[in-house]
């Protein structure tokens, strides 16, 4: 019984956060999944019509198109040194943060060698638009996989979980909208349970906190 007050507090806080998730929190969103999909498809089409362009060129052009639409103050510069590994849910990939705030994050995520794992269960909606390669995903009861190819957006709803895989050379633009701080432990716990890659953890925390602080204090973006 001594834990009852704590459990009650957690329940009340969770209830309030869930109410705010559908009422107040969306008023802070600046990104629209449909618009992001249109921007991505526009860049993908241009690259499909061109020759000699690399995957990195594609990623940089997506970033530039986003900055042109939303403004450089909200979209970080593409700096190769700011790519970091991401170990979460048994999967390992690479990511660079384009925008991070309390209510949203926008990243380029992918893998040069291929990966497979658990999506995690999040207090946020996740929109995963494939830029190059493929993502395969499935719910627990599925007997056939969902297949997402360039230009398609995979929407993982709040509270749901899937198994997913991406072959080598697959990259995507990922938008999460919700209580972003609640997602962070999922991205950090593998450091202590398996990888012990403290440098990557430090870089991830630093880059995330830097951008959240900038958007909260400078851009007044929650």
UniProtKB/Swiss-Prot annotation:
Induction conditions: Expression is increased during ergosterol starvation, during anaerobic growth or in the presence of SR31747A, a sterol isomerase inhibitor. Exogenously-supplied zymosterol is entirely transformed into ergosterol, which represses ERG2 expression. However, exogenously-supplied ergosterol does not affect ERG2 expression.
Subcellular location: Endoplasmic reticulum membrane
Taxonomic superkingdom: Eukaryota
Tagged with keyword Oxidoreductase: no
Broad class of where this protein is predominantly found: endoplasmic reticulum
Enzyme Commission number(s): 5.-.-.-
Pathway terms, separated by semicolons: Steroid metabolism; ergosterol biosynthesis; ergosterol from zymosterol: step 2/5
Recorded GO CC terms: endoplasmic reticulum; endoplasmic reticulum membrane
Regions that span the bilayer: 3-23
Regulation: Catalytic activity is inhibited by the morphilines tridemorph, fenpropimorph, and fenpropidin.
Example of a GO MF term: C-8 sterol isomerase activity
Catalysed reactions, as listed in the record: fecosterol = episterol
Gene ablation phenotype (knockout): Abolishes the production of ergosterol.
Keywords, in A-Z order: Endoplasmic reticulum, Isomerase, Lipid biosynthesis, Lipid metabolism, Membrane, Steroid biosynthesis, Steroid metabolism, Sterol biosynthesis, Sterol metabolism, Transmembrane, Transmembrane helix
Topology with respect to the bilayer: Single-pass membrane protein
Gene Ontology BP, a term: ergosterol biosynthetic process
General remark: Present with 2640 molecules/cell in log phase SD medium.
PANTHER family: SIGMA 1-TYPE OPIOID RECEPTOR-RELATED, SIGMA NON-OPIOID INTRACELLULAR RECEPTOR 1
Biological role stated in the UniProt entry: The third module or late pathway involves the ergosterol synthesis itself through consecutive reactions that mainly occur in the endoplasmic reticulum (ER) membrane. Firstly, the squalene synthase ERG9 catalyzes the condensation of 2 farnesyl pyrophosphate moieties to form squalene, which is the precursor of all steroids.
Family: Belongs to the ERG2 family.
Name of the protein described by the UniProt record: C-8 sterol isomerase ERG2
Gene encoding the protein: ERG2
């Amino acid at each position: 019984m001594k834990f009852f007050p704590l459990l009650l507090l957690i329940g009340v806080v969770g209830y309030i956060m869930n109410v705010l998730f559908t009422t107040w929190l969306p008023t802070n969103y600046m990104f629209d999944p449909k618009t992001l999909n249109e921007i991505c498809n526009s860049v993908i089409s241009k690259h499909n019509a061109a020759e000699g362009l690399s995957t990195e060129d594609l990623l940089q052009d997506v970033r530039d198109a986003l900055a042109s639409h939303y403004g450089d103050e909200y979209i970080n510069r593409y700096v190769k040194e700011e790519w970091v590994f991401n170990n979460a849910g048994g999967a390992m990939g690479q990511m660079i943060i384009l925008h991070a705030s309390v209510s949203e994050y926008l990243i380029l995520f992918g893998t040069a060698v291929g990966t497979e794992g658990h999506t995690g269960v999040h207090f946020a909606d996740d929109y995963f638009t494939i830029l190059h390669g493929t993502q395969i995903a499935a719910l627990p009861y599925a007997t056939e996989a969902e297949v997402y190819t360039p230009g398609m957006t995979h929407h993982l709803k709040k509270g749901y979980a899937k198994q997913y895989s991406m072959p080598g050379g697959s990259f995507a633009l990922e938008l999460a909208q919700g209580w972003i701080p609640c997602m962070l432990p999922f991205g950090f716990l593998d450091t202590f349970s398996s990888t012990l890659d403290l440098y990557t953890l430090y870089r991830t925390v630093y880059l995330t906190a830097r951008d959240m602080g900038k958007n909260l204090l400078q851009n007044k973006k929650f």
